[in-house]
A protein has these predicted regions:
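Flavin-dependent oxidoreductase catalytic cores
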Residues: 1-172
Length: 172
């Protein structure tokens, strides 16, 4: 069999296949249908410093040629995530990439500091999601905001960090 391994930000993955954050929960929801051991990484749904209920329903609309969603980053919060989801993912032979979200720099830093000593492989900092009204989209569309949040997070993260940038700009 061919060697499919890749190096992502200094972390060796057995293959380049991961799931997009937000589409796969933290893996448990799909583990009966997808062998998580075959993935190079599981990128989790966004995790915030406290639980978020997300947007009111309906959150998904089918349209000609696809679908639109505005889930609003519903998540259990960092404490439950660390207690429940990380141990679940550790049973599999795959890398763990945690998507971090927040409404403010302080909220992002709360999550990053909490994850620093957890057995995860990388953090993906979500500064791209357009359905977060406070903070998230502002960081992702302003170069100074991106620079600030990235440099502050790097002060506390012990794992490699990747930034999930917004496509809602004229130039990246």
């Amino acid at each position: 069999m061919s060697n499919m391994s890749v190096n992502v930000a200094g972390v060796e993955w057995k293959n380049p296949v991961t799931v997009a954050s937000g589409t796969f929960g933290s893996g448990a929801e799909y583990s009966e249908f997808v062998d998580l051991n075959r993935l190079g990484a599981v990128t989790t749904k966004g995790v915030a410093n406290k639980p978020w209920e997300g947007n009111p329903t309906p959150r998904v609309a089918e349209v000609y040629g696809g679908m639109l969603n505005a889930v609003g980053l519903q998540n259990p919060g960092i404490e439950l995530f660390c207690k429940r989801d990380i141990p679940f993912l550790k049973q599999f032979d795959t890398r763990i990439v945690v998507n971090v979200c927040g409404h403010s720099l302080d909220e992002y830093l709360d999550v990053v500091k909490r994850l620093a000593d957890e057995p995860i492989d990388m953090m993906e900092i979500n500064i791209s999601c357009p359905n977060v009204k406070e903070g998230g989209i502002a960081f992702g569309t302003d170069p100074k905001g991106v620079e600030t949040i990235t440099s502050e997070i790097k002060k506390y993260a012990k794992q490699p960090v990747i930034m999930k940038l917004s496509p809602n700009v004229t130039s990246i």
